[in-house]
Amino acid sequence: ISSCSDENDIFDSSSARRMNAMLQECNEILTGAENGWIFEYYPEDSKYGGFQLYMTFSKEGEVKVTAESPILESPGEQVTSMYQVKADMGPVLSFDTYNRILHQFSDPNPDGLGYEGDYEFVILTINKDGIELRGKKTGVKMQMIPLPAGTTWESYSNRLNKMIQAFPGFTMRLNIDGTVIAVSYTHLRAHETR
């Protein structure tokens, strides 16, 4: 027994055209942020905490990156490299030429791991108010938010540093199955102390 039935297209255009339109939209949003983006970067899900990176994207495929002072040797330093938004597992933001600030999180150290971070990110959601990303290698979710109008990276970073200074840190002791572990919390980083 056979039958024929008409199949209606679910989408108005092909998957390739929809992907190209999405890639164009991603590029327009990345380059359209007047003051750039704050990238809340997590190199690994639970080991290192998060880092604030500041990025500006050009239509020519360049990205300028700077970061909070604990990451940089010289505060205020900017490093320029190339980026692209490409089709892969959906739209992917790829920092595909070496950027000393960003790639330090994905560079292996002598044991082969380093910070275990990413330099390619699947774009989960994107609009002018923010971008939700997932590390392509690690699967760690991160976000980018536009730096507010009238705010510079320096003033934003200074406010962040004042908040850090307001929290001097603390030490707490955890008892896990009879083993006592002291954990110090300073400058928004947790460290095991013995």
Regions found by a protein language model. Give the residues of each.
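An anionic, turn-rich surface loop/hairpin at beta-sheet edges
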Residues: 94-116
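A recognition module on extended beta-rich or small alphabeta surfaces enriched in W/G with H and D/E
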Residues: 111-127
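Conserved small/polar residues in nucleotide/adenosyl-binding loops
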Residues: 186-193
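Aromatic- and glycine-enriched pocket-lining scaffold segments that form the walls
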Residues: 176
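Conserved, compact domain cores that house catalytic/ligand-binding motifs in diverse enzymes
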Residues: 180-185
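Acidic/polar, low-complexity intrinsically disordered N-terminal segments immediately downstream
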Residues: 5-94, 100, 126-130, 136-143, ...
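Sec-dependent bacterial lipoprotein signal peptides
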Residues: 1-3
